[in-house]
């Protein structure tokens, strides 16, 4: 029995190691500002940078602006617009031609509701976010895969994507401590494909309240079935927020 358990454990470790070699590693960093206009109503701005390909390549830049309203003590609504400038990796077409990497703009809108409940020092929250992303059409350079000679530009058709992102999160309030650890799981459902799961994210992180106006966020994230504008696999993240 012990031998069987050992072999089963060894198989799991080998499988995980092989999978880890296939996964990418990305770095996500962000800087944001939040302002309370009046009671229960906030506005926010955020800029973000993401890398991919084992941290060696720029993945995307983005900027967002949003508003949030606290409906009750346990329910909050928010909406935002995000402009994404995505670095599309090079690819080979079905005919063997080469399309070098190119920058691609995307427009994203979302509306979300977040409900929370506290139990002792734990706080559990459920966030449901409807998200729509539109990729405008554009023409990109294309070259012959054999001799590298220029070909007629490739036309990339515009495309929209509707998803529902469901995130369950737990935070823990440590007595007399400026650090707040959290863990979450998020599922992304494709609304254009009968709710099929497009992506799963697992996150472990900690929020660090430096002062009344300054805060940091550090986290590790793993995701599978990632879409094209995000690293598939492991992500290390850091964010800074200024509240005034």
Q: Model-flagged regions — what are they?
A:
Residues 52-54, 58-60, 70, 74-136, ...:
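Outer-membrane beta-barrel translocator/channel fold
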Residues 31-35, 65-69, 111-115, 128-130, ...:
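Residues on the lipid-exposed face of transmembrane beta-strands in outer-membrane beta-barrel proteins
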């Amino acid at each position: 029995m012990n031998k069987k358990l050992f072999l089963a454990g060894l198989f799991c470790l080998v499988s995980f190691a092989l999978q880890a070699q296939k996964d990418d590693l990305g770095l996500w960093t962000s800087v944001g500002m939040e302002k309370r206009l009046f009671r229960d109503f906030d506005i926010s701005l955020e800029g973000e940078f993401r890398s991919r390909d084992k941290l060696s390549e720029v993945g995307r830049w983005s900027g967002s602006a949003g508003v949030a309203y606290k409906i009750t003590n346990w329910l909050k609504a928010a909406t935002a617009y995000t402009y994404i400038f995505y670095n599309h990796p090079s690819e080979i077409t079905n005919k063997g031609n080469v399309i070098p990497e190119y920058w691609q703009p995307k427009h994203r809108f979302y509306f979300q509701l977040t409900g929370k409940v506290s139990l002792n020092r734990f706080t559990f929250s459920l966030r449901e976010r409807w998200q729509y992303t539109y990729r405008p059409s554009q023409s990109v350079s294309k070259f012959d895969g054999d001799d590298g000679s220029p070909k007629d530009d490739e036309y990339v058709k515009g495309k929209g994507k509707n998803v529902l992102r469901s995130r369950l999160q737990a935070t823990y309030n440590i007595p007399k401590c400026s650090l707040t650890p959290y863990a979450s799981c998020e599922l992304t459902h494709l609304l254009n494909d009968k709710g099929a799961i497009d992506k799963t994210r697992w996150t472990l992180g900690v929020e660090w309240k430096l002062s009344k106006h300054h805060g940091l966020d550090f986290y590790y994230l793993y995701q599978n079935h990632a879409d094209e504008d995000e690293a598939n696999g492991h992500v290390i993240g850091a964010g800074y927020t200024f509240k005034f």
